[in-house]
């Protein structure tokens, strides 16, 4: 009877010793799941004020969710996660993104909405595989010209920022099908809008638009144009003829 008890104690010690021998990175690694063929890790809603240092050792990560925490800074170590395809940072307190984000050359989806960004690093333009980018609910008044390189971008959300005009780089994003600019400070839409030939959804509600450019009629793929809560007094006759896409 006593021998059996002694054996149990030894087993317990061996078990706990194995746990202690794991590196911190390995402990986090156990939370990685395989989802649709991707290595996915979610640390959402963990009350994180800083990213655990060990996270930057998980080079195999392809999808990382750090949303709904209290992160104020992302360190340059982000560049180590060069296999990232999806990075979710929404609902934090980030005032900037590290320039090293430009080294994530495989990145296709980036969510940074509901943060405190006042600018976007030029280096983001190096992430030329990006297809979805949400920068909504920040404090942005412009975007760097380097984002003209995001020619594969299909969905761009810039709503709830401080944009007085559509950033020039947007007109080079020829693959855009969805452009959300609601609740900014836009007073007009430039004729350059006609460059976005693939655009299907354009949302500009809640701005200060007074008129519409004739160039909008060149967007033959447009299915939804939301102009609610503006001050539009001048609508070209050509728009009336295509009023089926106006919301």
Question: What is the predicted role of each segment?
Answer:
Residues 1-214, 223-224, 229-247:
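The feature captures the LRR N-terminal capping module
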